[in-house]
From Swiss-Prot:
Phenotype of the disrupted gene, per the record: Not essential, plants grow and produce fertile seeds. Plants are pale green under 100 umol photons/m(2)/s at 25 degrees Celsius, pale green and 'dwarfed' under 10 umol photons/m(2)/s at 20 degrees Celsius. Loss of PSII-light harvesting supercomplexes without a decrease of major antenna proteins, in 'dwarf' conditions loss of minor antenna chlorophyll a-b binding proteins CP26 (Lhcb5), decreased levels of CP29 (Lhcb4). Altered phosphorylation state of PSII and LHCII, impaired non-photochemical energy quenching.
InterPro entries, sorted: PSII_PsbZ, PSII_PsbZ_sf
Source organism of this protein record: Nicotiana tabacum
Origin superkingdom: Eukaryota
Membrane topology: Multi-pass membrane protein
Pfam family, one: Ycf9
Gene name, Swiss-Prot/TrEMBL: psbZ
Subunit structure and binding partners: PSII is composed of 1 copy each of membrane proteins PsbA, PsbB, PsbC, PsbD, PsbE, PsbF, PsbH, PsbI, PsbJ, PsbK, PsbL, PsbM, PsbT, PsbY, PsbZ, Psb30/Ycf12, at least 3 peripheral proteins of the oxygen-evolving complex and a large number of cofactors. It forms dimeric complexes.
Main function: Controls the interaction of photosystem II (PSII) cores with the light-harvesting antenna, aiding in the dissipation of excitation energy within PSII. PSII is a light-driven water plastoquinone oxidoreductase, using light energy to abstract electrons from H(2)O, generating a proton gradient subsequently used for ATP formation.
Protein name, as recorded: Photosystem II reaction center protein Z
Gene Ontology cellular component annotations, sorted alphabetically: chloroplast thylakoid membrane; photosystem II reaction center
HAMAP family per UniProt: PSII_PsbZ
Transmembrane segments: 8-28, 41-61
Annotated family: Belongs to the PsbZ family.
Length: 62
């Protein structure tokens, strides 16, 4: 269970870093938002899901 929690936290941190870099790039590029809207929404949905997963796993561990 601890390994699953650690992997979920790592995935959350990695996803956060990827979104931290990619979202401003998408907004700054001309025509970037209209062509990459689905990718940004998918990444954001993944991030929200990982936040809930980490919270649930944290409550099971402690």
């Amino acid at each position: 269970m601890t390994l699953a929690f650690q992997l979920a936290v790592f995935a959350l941190i990695a996803t956060s870093l990827i979104l931290l870099i990619s979202v401003p790039v998408v907004f700054a590029s001309p025509d970037g938002w209209s062509s990459n809207k689905n990718v940004v929404f998918s990444g954001t949905s993944l991030w929200i899901g990982l936040v809930f997963l980490v919270g649930i796993l944290n409550s099971l561990i402690s």
